[in-house]
Amino acid sequence: MKKFLATLLTLCMVLGACSALAEVTYPVETSTTLTIWKQLDGSIADGGYTTSMDTPGFKAWCEKSGIQVELKEFADATSLVLSLNGATTLPDMFMFNAGRDYNGGVAGLIADEMVQVIEPAMLEQYAPDYWAYINKPIYMNEITQLDGKMYYLAGHIFEEKSPYRYWRGLFYRQDILDAIGRDVPQTIDEFYDTLVAMKEHGVETPFVFQGKTDLRDCLKNGELTSAFGLVNTAEYQADGQWHFGAYEPEYKDVLAFMKKLYDEGLISVDYLSMEEATSRAMFCTGEAGVMYGNNSRLNTYLSSLEEGGSMVGGHVIHAADQDHAMFSYADPMTTSDDITFISADCKNVELCMELYNYLYTEEGNMIRNYGIEGESYTIGENGKPQYTDLVLHNPDGHSMDGVARSYALINWPGIHANDQLAMRHPEDSQIVAYERWSNTDHDEHVVIHTAVLDEYLDEYTDLWTDINLYIDECRAKFISGEMSIENDFDAYIDTLKSMGMDRVCEIKQITLDAHNAALAE
């Protein structure tokens, strides 16, 4: 244990001058209870829990920090946002992906006066461990807004050069590939031929998506689009120019390919309504042979596989004349999930920072990543944590990932330690998946700051709300055949123009230029 903690301490001292900062003594002496709103982490259900307040990890955080929390969890981000907008008094803190789920993103929250500025001087005094870790360009470039200020505490933070940022992609039933005599496909032709061969082998619906929005996300994340000369179907940059894939001419070929899969029964006609329980059952029983989804689910799926079944991570699909794909899913170094806002109504800012900071202390980091020593993990002979049988072979039949997330605080803010991620993804299929999913040009094309400049926010929001809905509707109609790709695609582009898509592009380009200029300073 001492060896491992010494390593953590060394890392902390390298990343920030810890000795120059204040030190918070835990447990904090206070009778104040903080209020936090957050979307429910559904993964804890696989660990036997229905609310985070009952999990060992959350209880340990409150106990060890000395700060009690009244936690309100929401089924989804929409419910959380509606409650925020309708609240007479906001909670002390709230955590969610504002860039994705709030109108106008972080800039919208600022404009609506929902949040407080996070002052560096306050962090130095009340969150010194967090500040020592985060105060580096690789992280600060992501969390600092154009005005040079911070308005939230970071969500999940990856260690530098972590392959675990790339945690979504294609995975295959290896036993089915073996049965049809095929390798894991890399090119779009190999991918299509593999799906056809699976269908001929008796696989009812070869390609499924983990959840009902994941066909959309598969394309937005560039999983298949490189083969058609398109980075992705969402926003990206190329040589400093902002693009939106679903407004590019190459999008027509992407849609034609997806319609071909739909027409030939290679994807489900119910993809828009299929829940994960259904897609999981299909994949695990051999009714499907390929899934687009999360790496962490592989652990859960392994226990449900039919006898003789096996899995392997796939490549991000590209064209025959490409060495690798242009894009893939990847989290930023500081992820957008569970970024933590201190609300405008909060009267206990110092205490909020102290609670948050605890997750960056040596003790708090261990709880956040591994849980309770002696229960969910022990320190091995190599000085590193290792899961106990409670996690690896849970006596109540709960999944490894579900128990790990319940005893630790993995889906809460903090450092995603590489050792923890390796422990939770130990299967060869998962290791291979991370290697393959990270072999793309993602970081060349990703738009780090997606929120538009304040002066354009209202105009952009008015335009984008309807445009985004129209793009989603047309995608589904093109794939199903309700709209003709050959006859209606040009009209689709023209409609986007009439709705103001060119103006959206102008606003986003102005924003991208401003962010790139700020980063260059």
Predicted regions span which residues?
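N-terminal hydrophobic targeting signals that begin at the initiator methionine
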Residues: M1-K2
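Hydrophobic core
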Residues: L9, M13-A17
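Extracytoplasmic/secretory soluble proteins
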Residues: L5, L9, L21-E521
